[in-house]
Amino acid sequence: MCAARLSAAAQSTVYAFSARPLTGGEPVSLGSLRGKVLLIENVASLUGTTIRDYTEMNDLQKRLGPRGLVVLGFPCNQFGHQENGKNEEILNSLKYVRPGGGFEPNFTLFEKCEVNGEKAHPLFTFLRNALPTPSDDPTALMTDPKYIIWSPVCRNDIAWNFEKFLVGPDGVPVRRYSRRFRTIDIEPDIETLLSQQSGNS
């Protein structure tokens, strides 16, 4: 079953995919981001690393956005039910609960989606097939089987909230990072891609 899903993601870039912003409106085509370096994360409001990862995502977008980085967050409730609110509740949860203190993401958040299983968003099926394991933890798997609430279960499944996918300015996925790899520590790899981007322009 997992191998059969490869054909569904027989694309070479992320530009074939689109997603609807959390705030509503028309779907955003990732094709509109050609030439940008993309950092894509599956996020959750109630995770143990929510504060760390959201603030680091904001930091990278603020500092590197003007040079061509675009951070994209996809809320997902598949890991410990840690994004169990409705789409319209997520921004208030971030603002008042975690991270709290009036926090507002300065990057694009999309509507809740699934990232594993039969109902996975096609973008994440593509990303998982393009980069089957995190570069920093090739043996990463869901640590507790009772949390697996999707089917089919595949070897390339995302293991938890805040896995990261770095995509080059040509739309090709470059590297995948586990939940344990801090968002801010991706900066050197982003810098490398940004320098390649400016060298090609």
UniProtKB/Swiss-Prot annotation:
PROSITE patterns named among the record's database cross-references: GLUTATHIONE_PEROXID_1 (PS00460), GLUTATHIONE_PEROXID_2 (PS00763), GLUTATHIONE_PEROXID_3 (PS51355)
The keyword Chloroplast is annotated on this UniProt entry: no
Keyword terms, alphabetized: Acetylation, Cytoplasm, Lipid metabolism, Mitochondrion, Oxidoreductase, Peroxidase, Phosphoprotein, Selenocysteine
N6-acetyllysine: modified positions: 62, 86, 112, 119, 146
Post-translational modification: During periods of oxidative stress, Sec-47 may react with a superoxide radical, irreversibly lose hydroselenide and be converted to dehydroalanine.
Top enzyme category: oxidoreductase
N6-succinyllysine PTM positions: 62, 86, 112, 146
UniProt keyword annotation of Glycoprotein present: no
Gene Ontology MF terms: glutathione peroxidase activity; peroxidase activity; phospholipid-hydroperoxide glutathione peroxidase activity; protein tyrosine kinase binding; SH3 domain binding
Catalytic activity: 2 glutathione + H2O2 = glutathione disulfide + 2 H2O; a hydroperoxy polyunsaturated fatty acid + 2 glutathione = a hydroxy polyunsaturated fatty acid + glutathione disulfide + H2O; tert-butyl hydroperoxide + 2 glutathione = tert-butanol + glutathione disulfide + H2O; cumene hydroperoxide + 2 glutathione = 2-phenylpropan-2-ol + glutathione disulfide + H2O
Consequence of gene loss (knockout): Mutants are healthy, fertile and show no increased sensitivity to hyperoxia. Mice display enhanced susceptibility to paraquat and cortical neurons from Gpx1-deficient mice are more susceptible to H2O2-mediated toxicity than neurons from wild-type mice. Gpx1-deficient mice are smaller than wild type littermates and the liver has increased mitochondrial H2O2 production, increased lipid peroxides, and decreased mitochondrial energy output.
Tissue-level expression: Expressed in liver, kidney, lung, brain and heart.
A Pfam family the protein falls into: GSHPx
UniProt-listed Enzyme Commission number(s): 1.11.1.9, 1.11.1.12
Subunit text: Homotetramer. Interacts with MIEN1.
Name by which UniProt lists this protein: Glutathione peroxidase 1
